[in-house]
Amino acid sequence: MFQRLSSLFFSTPSPPEDPDCPRAFVSEEDEVDGWLIIDLPDSYAAPPSPGAAPAPAGRPPPAPSLMDESWFVTPPACFTAEGPGLGPARLQSSPLEDLLIEHPSMSVYVTGSTIVLEPGSPSPLPDAALPDGDLSEGELTPARREPRAARHAAPLPARAALLEKAGQVRRLQRARQRAERHALSAKAVQRQNRARESRPRRSKNQSSFIYQPCQRQFNY
């Protein structure tokens, strides 16, 4: 830019162009509010990449591809500033984020009924018990499913006891509800009211007063 101004004022001849030096393809530069805007001419073609393979002889040479984007935008200083309070806030990972990954015992996929083998106990499937011949996958499948069946067969008695207790509680609740409905029925209430209103009958033997006839007076 300063060379252009100096050439306009002092009329200094421009330096000779070197054929080996690439041409400048920028025709106009402008800086507005920290954004550098560069305009490229329409006739600019992208230089061929050095690693590109040469085109075969049977194909025509490809047409020069013009650059689709003629504007290059650089971010303003507020995005590239460094220091406290100048740049964007950087999020730091918390050490508690990988808690479940670092501690598999807290995973929700761990089942409670796991089989723990004692250090002195023999393995459930020793190598000596296996035959020397090759076995197919169908013959090995039952042997692999035996530990799983034993694992699920252990809590069956406890589950049966819980179901029996739940059945007893349900029967007691039904009997209690039936008694309450019977006590609150209309006929039962009517019988209770009639029993309260009715007076007990007195027997003749209980009366101690004896009625005697009075003396009659005849007027002749």
Curated annotation (Swiss-Prot):
Keyword Secreted on entry: no
Q: Where is this region: Disordered?
A: 1-24, 41-69, 119-220
Presence of keyword Nucleus = yes
**Biased composition, Polar residues: where in the chain?**
205-220
The residue ranges flagged as biased composition, category Low complexity, are: 1-12, 152-170
Q: Where in the cell is it found?
A: Cytoplasm, Cytosol; Nucleus; Nucleus, PML body; Cytoplasmic vesicle, Autophagosome
Q: What GO biological process terms are annotated to this protein in UniProt?
A: autophagosome assembly; negative regulation of protein localization; osteoblast differentiation; positive regulation of DNA-templated transcription; protein localization; tissue homeostasis; ubiquitin-dependent protein catabolic process
Q: Which GO terms describe its cellular component?
A: autophagosome; cytoplasmic vesicle; cytosol; nucleus; PML body
| Phosphoserine PTM sites in chain numbering | S14, S136
Biased composition range(s): Pro residues = 47-64
Keywords (A to Z) from UniProt: Activator, Autophagy, Cytoplasm, Cytoplasmic vesicle, Nucleus, Phosphoprotein, Transcription, Transcription regulation
Q: Which parts of the sequence form the motif LIR?
A: 26-41
Instruction: Return any one Pfam family short name.
Output: DOR
Q: What is its main location?
A: cytoplasm
UniProt GO molecular function: ubiquitin binding
Recorded hits in InterPro entries, A to Z, give: TP53INP (IPR029431)
Q: Which residues form a coiled coil?
A: none
Biological role stated in the UniProt entry: Dual regulator of transcription and autophagy. Positively regulates autophagy and is required for autophagosome formation and processing. May act as a scaffold protein that recruits MAP1LC3A, GABARAP and GABARAPL2 and brings them to the autophagosome membrane by interacting with VMP1 where, in cooperation with the BECN1-PI3-kinase class III complex, they trigger autophagosome development. Acts as a transcriptional activator of THRA.
Q: What is known of its domains?
A: The LC3 interacting region (LIR) motif mediates interaction with GABARAP, GABARAPL1, GABARAPL2, MAP1LC3A, MAP1LC3B and MAP1LC3C.
Q: How does it assemble?
A: Interacts with VMP1, GABARAP, GABARAPL1, GABARAPL2, MAP1LC3A, MAP1LC3B, MAP1LC3C and THRA.
Identification of the protein by name: Tumor protein p53-inducible nuclear protein 2
